Regions:
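Pre-Walker A (Motif I) flank of P-loop NTPase domains
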Residues: 2-5
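A glycine- and Lys/Arg-enriched "phosphate-lid" helix/loop adjacent to the NTP-binding pocket
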Residues: 57-65, 71-122
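Short catalytic/ligand-binding loop motif for oxyanion handling, primarily in non-cytosolic enzymes
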Residues: 15, 49-53, 89-93, 143-145
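Hydrophobic anchor at the beta1->P-loop junction of P-loop NTPases
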Residues: 8
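Conserved substrate/cofactor phosphate-moiety recognition/catalytic segment
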Residues: 11-14, 18-59
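NTP-dependent small-molecule kinase module
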Residues: 99-102, 109, 114-157
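Conserved beta-strand scaffold positions in the cores of enzyme catalytic domains, especially
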Residues: 28-31, 41-42, 81-83, 130-135
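A short acidic, often aromatic-flanked loop/helix-cap motif at beta-alpha or helix-coil junctions
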Residues: 36-39, 89, 139-146
Length: 157
């Protein structure tokens, strides 16, 4: 394993935090967003997500987006980006299931899952071939199966 940073990215309700928890369990640690282990830092949403979410919310500052992309490209040898996705109907069902459970204002916002999914796909088309970007369909595989795949690929140890 030679990566220092693992960024978990993807639409809302695509399984990023659940995967983060599974990675933590793999390392026998408590769950934590951005949990730092002795040799890697796992970040639940960071630069890749910032680019996608700025596009989604129409708040793109071109110079900032360019700088974020350049940072990702400059550090591609030290980073793995894990894109979790699910079909739009599954994302919408997960959103309905979650809505209001934690009482936060966030869950009162209805996210257009199709638009968000399209933005992530667009960003993948732009950057995917130049980055270490792993893609996992959380409809088809469990967090534990994803962790196992990451171990087999040498991304996790």
């Amino acid at each position: 394993m030679d990566k220092l940073i693992i960024e978990l990215t993807g639409c809302d309700r695509s399984g990023k935090s659940t995967l983060n928890s599974a990675i933590g369990e793999h390392y026998n640690r408590e769950y934590g967003i951005g949990k730092q282990f002795a040799h890697i830092c796992v970040i639940d949403r960071w630069l890749y997500d910032s680019i996608a979410l700025d596009r989604y919310f129409n708040r793109v500052i071109p110079e900032v987006e360019t700088a974020r992309k350049q940072f990702l490209l400059d550090n591609k040898d030290r980073m793995t980006i894990i894109w979790t996705y699910a079909s739009v109907p599954v994302l919408e069902a997960r959103q309905k299931e979650q809505k209001g459970l934690d009482g936060s204002d966030y869950n009162k916002i209805v996210i257009d899952m199709q638009k968000m999914s399209d933005i992530y796909k667009e960003l993948f088309d732009e950057l995917g071939k130049d980055l270490d970007l792993q893609i996992f369909d959380t409809d088809a595989c469990s967090p534990e199966e994803i962790v196992e795949s990451l171990i087999e690929q040498g991304i996790l140890d």
